[in-house]
Regions:
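Conserved two-metal-ion catalytic palm core of "right-hand" nucleic acid polymerases
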Residues: 1-200
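Short alpha-helical scaffolding segments that buttress acidic/His motifs in well-ordered protein cores
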Residues: 202-204
Length: 204
């Protein structure tokens, strides 16, 4: 059985949520209203708590001292409720992704180069999380890693500084690199790969 057979279950979606959320790129439209309401309550309690904690202990009133403990307990309870609501939401999303009828809704976007068409997926939670998990699966399975131009330049500068020889640097680019990849051969290879799960193949 493929190691990615369970890649669209709750745990995988939760990992995807944490990865995106840590970067501050988690959009509200992909989360449930109930979860968002609890998260807002938590932020308000955190704001009130910080307002009290900024005061020195000697300057706090008895009411404020009591409020600190109260807020901490309420925030702890709220965090548990958030976790439950998020689990319920992601479990439902997972079930819809794993259904046989689920597909990405691709919409063509305007492109400056007709040879480089652009497409966007639908704005649903199912499509967002499915794409996150699919991309992660492909990166892990095929060890896909794209270095940024800044990282490449830094490495190049380091190498040139270590060697005092004279060099000429020529910058080149492959025209329409990704567009030139024969898709029929690529999909044939993916279809025959036993490590890639059936769901990922169907989404591709």
């Amino acid at each position: 059985m493929s190691q990615y057979s369970f890649s669209y279950n709750y745990d995988s979606l939760y990992d995807a949520f944490n990865t995106v959320n840590r970067k501050g790129k988690m959009q509200k439209r992909y989360l449930s209203p109930e979860y968002l309401a609890k998260a807002q309550e938590y932020r308000e309690m955190r704001k009130n708590l910080n307002k009290i904690l900024r005061k020195k202990k000697a300057e706090r009133t008895e009411e404020e001292t009591s409020e600190v403990d109260k807020l901490k307990q309420l925030m702890k309870n709220n965090a548990q409720q958030q976790k439950i609501l998020l689990q319920e939401h992601l479990s439902k999303v997972s079930s819809r992704i794993l259904s046989s009828s689920f597909r990405f809704n691709l919409t063509p976007d305007a492109s400056e180069d007709p040879q480089k068409p652009l497409y966007t997926i639908g704005a649903t939670a199912e499509e967002f999380f499915a794409m996150q998990v699919l991309c992660r699966n492909m990166k892990k399975l095929f060890k896909i890693s794209m270095s940024s131009r800044h990282e490449i330049l830094f490495q190049l500068k380091t190498l040139l500084m270590e060697d005092k020889s004279r060099y000429y640097i020529i910058r080149t680019d492959v025209c329409h690199c990704f567009e030139s990849i024969p898709h029929d051969k690529l999909f044939k290879y993916l279809e025959g790969n036993n490590l890639l799960d059936v769901k990922s193949k169907s989404l591709l």
